[in-house]
Amino acid sequence: MACLSWTFHSPSLRMATHAFVVLPEYPAQPQNTLILLHGLSGACDTWNRRTSIERYAQKHNLAVIMPEVQRSWYTDMVYGLPYFTFITDELPRLAANTLRVPVDPAHLYVGGLSMGGYGALKCVLTYPERYAGCISLSARCSVQNKLKLIENDPGQIREWQAILGEDLTVKPENDLYALLARIQKPAASPRFYVACGTEDFLYSESVEMAAALQQTFDHVEYEEWPGVHDWVFWDAAIPRGLISVLPREEKAE
């Protein structure tokens, strides 16, 4: 596999930005592309530093693109940058043009952990027709729950005001359950893999989200096992997620 630090200009962000990329080496062409999203304290290279994602991608002849979004919660910020537009509209197009990877709906996947799990779910629930599958690990599934935890933290309140606005209103486009409620049962249903450790502080949110997804989508696999909110769990979960959502004919022996 080839590992690339990709620096490029983003028109939507109006600046240069970064992504870490894992690609099958020449002459192999990737069969699918995964946009893999970092958590709140992470960066574009964190998945590669903390897991064996390169080895897992090689088993599936998979291209993995890990973008940088700061602490934006994968949102078009009220007082900040349009990171959701960047992830959903711009990044796939730039990846196809520059890296020559497949980004059509049959071959594009998105996944992430914690804040990135929220971002991955938000991508697919906003645009279910654009993705073949979603991997959500230890996701924060309720922004409202997060806001309750920061009521006495001025620093985080300011951070969230930049994201949501001064009144901290969670609009439907940032509410996973509101997005899910809008969806009519799609003809081509994306596949979902949801996992969380049973000792994770976000455990109940993953359980509830998986149950809600199963009411709308045909292919939703939920797994749990003993674990907390850490890389031990996520390194074990990401290869299981790939096996769950990728087409069977393209999985490793």
Place the predicted regions along the sequence by residue.
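Non-catalytic cap/lid and distal C-terminal segments of serine-dependent acyl enzymes
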Residues: 1-253
